[in-house]
């Protein structure tokens, strides 16, 4: 028999070392049942069920006397993650990328026969028709170009900039997985609230609002700068390019918010776990945090898998844009920079920044979910804990080793800083080859002079 102080109930409770071990298996695919789901159950039947299966939750004990007097949590507080990123979701739906539907129960769903899907399809068809006319015009401009390739990089770049329209159908294909991740966060918040007694507070709403407002403005500004520096500037051609750039960078904003949510949640969970270890009695408390961490680790993996094809395409597209833009800039070094090179510089800078943030935020989220949590576990003092608690701590450490928390794009590659370094190294290799190929080709005036000299001789 051992005594310990429970900070939640403010009482000294006792636990027996020789008590029979209850089943603490963690089922990550089981949806937790809210406390108010069993209002009509008779008291005797509810008490019998609580005594046997812990109120049918995922390894959690029944309510404490303190929690019995807590009011039910409002529905809008059970999906704080969605509410924090809601401005970005609204912008993505407005530009036809993410046709999600909010259910009356508070969940999120992807329904083909829904008003949001109909709007996204109509928006995509109108944008496709608009871009088709612009593409024909751009192809005609490329055909009439004369001179070397490096002198017409911007014209080719405008054709490549049409490719982000493929993001829309790719996201439609993956919207069901994205919605599943959003609902997974709702389940995580439910389990977190039942474990800690309070709601998950992220405080990311302001960041999401800033991203949703500033990114479309900055994208439109960069596209306008690029078009103004062109000789054949046409105002009507700026609008679809602004939409396409907004789609690309708003997907970057979505990725940033997803990774930032993982990072902040991992930090909060680590602090709560460290605070709970100060008064650990039964080993069930450690088991509860282990189940929470396993859910968070699964959410980190699902974040990458849910948009694997979309962000694989975005990374390859950004790599191609960066290579083409920097090649156009470096090829003009001998002739000096002009006004038209401003657009190339802006495009290269923005693309490098977006690619860096995609890789860096995923790296930071993976570090906080796994490595930072392992440090907290390794710093735990086990000498004063009972045997069951020590066993649960060791099982927790083993779980962090066996469950990878890296954000992986469908098995293609891990998104981290190593990916950014590899892409830059490959880009430098391509640039060196292209510049050597350019140097080996003589200019037209020198070629004509050599031809005239040979004819005179």
Curated annotation (Swiss-Prot):
Q: Does the keyword Transmembrane helix apply?
A: yes
Q: Write out the transmembrane intervals.
A: 116-136, 153-173, 210-230, 238-258, 310-330, 342-362, 422-442
User: Which cellular compartments is it found in?
Assistant: Cell membrane
Record's superkingdom? Eukaryota
The GO molecular function terms of this record are: olfactory receptor activity; taste receptor activity
Keyword Transmembrane assigned to the entry: answer is yes
User: Which organism does this record belong to?
Assistant: Anopheles gambiae (African malaria mosquito)
- Which protein are we looking at? Gustatory and odorant receptor 24
